[in-house]
Amino acid sequence: MLTITEIKSYISEAITQYQSVYVGADIVPVTVCPASRRRAVRNRVINECGLDYKEDAYGTDAEVIFGPNGKQILIYQSMMKTKQQVLHALWHEFGHHLSGDEKQYGINLERDTPMRSGYAVFNEFVAEYIAYTVNDAEPFRNAMGSHIYLQMAFHEERTINPYWLSRYFAIVLGDSAVSEDDFAFGQSLVSPAVWNYINQILNVLISQIKKPDFWIADAEFLETLGCLFDEMFHLVFMGA
């Protein structure tokens, strides 16, 4: 585990590298959450952002706290083992800040709609993809990483985890270590029908990241992405 001092020393480097790619992008305050005072520091930041409560996803390495009084990024000392891990975690959270949240798209997360499904995939995809565009030397990465993410996305029977599916697409499109052959191997891990949807979703994401401001989605894109995900989910639920 890195020390608080070590983590803080890497924050300015993360900001410099990020803003060299995303010129003019603003940065929100970053707070290092000590392992020994995780709950207290996290609660303080939540209150400063104007929230009374935000569910704590133990095991996450960093997160954006977004409330009526502003945004802050929390990075957790207990999860930080290397400099590159700190950098990548911060770039990922900077990506979340850059791309915004569901409110700007008018999405009600309590309603099951294609827009919500599309946002669920795009939200994590774009943050992770942005991190790769800054520097794709992600810790622990290798060409097999995409296969692991794909397997995790479909690990539970008759369901799909959109978080791991988003990470899968981000590593396929953003990690230079993943070749076309590596991607093609994925078809051996899922059914032909599911693989067809994987390719359709990939093509939709490729079209999006070709845009100069790819991190800003529109309703048509999210609807298309969400419909594809929902159709694939139905196939998996039915046992495909």
Go through the PLM ranges and name each one:
Residues 17, 97, 101-102, 129-137:
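Active-site catalytic microenvironments for nucleophilic, acid-base chemistry
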Residues 44-85, 94, 100-101:
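Active-site scaffold of zinc-dependent metalloenzymes
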Residues 1-63, 211-215, 234-237:
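A metal-dependent hydrolase signature that marks the N-terminal structural subdomain at the beginning
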Residues 88:
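Membrane-embedded glycan transfer/ligation machinery
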Residues 114-177:
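Metalloprotease/metallohydrolase-associated module, dominated by Zn2+-dependent proteases
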Residues 84, 99-127:
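Post-HEXXH active-site segment of zinc metalloproteases
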Residues 149-240:
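Pan-zinc metallopeptidase signature
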